[in-house]
């Protein structure tokens, strides 16, 4: 009961904060300060992690860079705010960050009660389980009685409880606030099982002391549509963040890459001309509050969606995650962009 009351109070408080924070045009604020403030994970290889020099890279980081490129024509005009699962929502609601690009699941509660706008989904994921091979477990249905490491304040924690209850299994939750704490506890043997989004398991396995000693079980127990989130009340900023994603998708579909984007401006295809802002009467960029070079600037900065995926989490990365649902609609996946016209 106490937890429900606290949750209700938090929801009411952040709704009030959100209404104030979104009253001003975010684009104007971003331009005035000269950079995009992007909320990211505290450190998740492939998605958002700093190197020894403090330089950030990853799938979500590239989205932050793409937004900066669209707004300023300069992908370096972005600053990163590392946030834990517990910290991320207050940071967005209060205006501390302009956009949250932090492997965050879109849910009805977050979309309504917390006052966020999600969509589009830039990564379709699902929750899974990682165990030590020595446990001799082949299925999540064999995990009854196991100690399970999980991060609090996440859909992962809620899905875990639902899955074990539905399947009449018992488990002992080992709960931590920060991802680094969960990872360290699992690596130290404080729990038998690690559960989070499957993409996260592939990422976190790389950081373990003996990665090859661990396996990811086949079950996917949830739908985890991940993507950037912004505050409600600013449709222009929401449109910009959304169309940054769609530009990445459309670029891949058109075959426009980081290497050939300038050459593709010469394409006779009117759809490509319109997309790249070279059509004589194109107003797509200005309708967004950007220049007509917005899509070109995005692609020059980070490439297309396929390039962003492969470089950070796909075939060209240590994670080697397959595209799956995140392939384009015409290649067996469900990623596609609305018409650019």
Predicted stretch roles:
Residues 31-32, 68-76, 93-97, 105, ...:
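Sec-exported extracytoplasmic/periplasmic mature domains
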Residues 62-65, 69-71, 134-137, 141, ...:
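Extended ligand-binding regions for polar small-molecule ligands
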Residues 37-46, 56-71, 105, 125-181:
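Bilobed "Venus flytrap"/periplasmic-binding protein-like clamshell domains
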Residues 1-9:
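Bacterial N-terminal signal peptides that target proteins for export
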Residues 24, 31-101, 283-284, 290-293, ...:
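Extracytoplasmic small-molecule ligand-binding "clamshell" domains
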Residues 17-24:
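Sec/Tat signal peptide C-region and signal peptidase I cleavage site
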Residues 65, 69, 73, 77-142, ...:
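Acidic, polar ligand-binding/catalytic clefts
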Residues 78-90, 173-188:
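Short helix-initiation/N-cap motifs at beta->coil->alpha
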